[in-house]
Amino acid sequence: MRLSMDEIVNAICIHMAERKQVRPTDVLVELCWDEENGFTAEVTIQGRLQYLVEANMLEAIERYMFSEYNRRVYRDQIHLDVEDEMWADIHD
């Protein structure tokens, strides 16, 4: 299974909204990748900027997979990749 960039953003929005007790629409996410830091996300909630590392992103995807697809997946089953856009491959 493959999650699109939009689904990764949705996963992070839902995850951070639950953690910060705001609506998912109040969360802005920008996905990033560079050779030095790997996969990261810039999250803005109520004017405050927070950076998520890959482990945080994987946690959000794990929770998203369970809540949206009723599938329990673990971090070693999720592989993030990027070309023109970022995606996540979910392996069984």
Regions found by a protein language model. Name each.
Residues M1-D92:
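Protein-protein interaction and targeting regions used for scaffolding, dimerization, and localization
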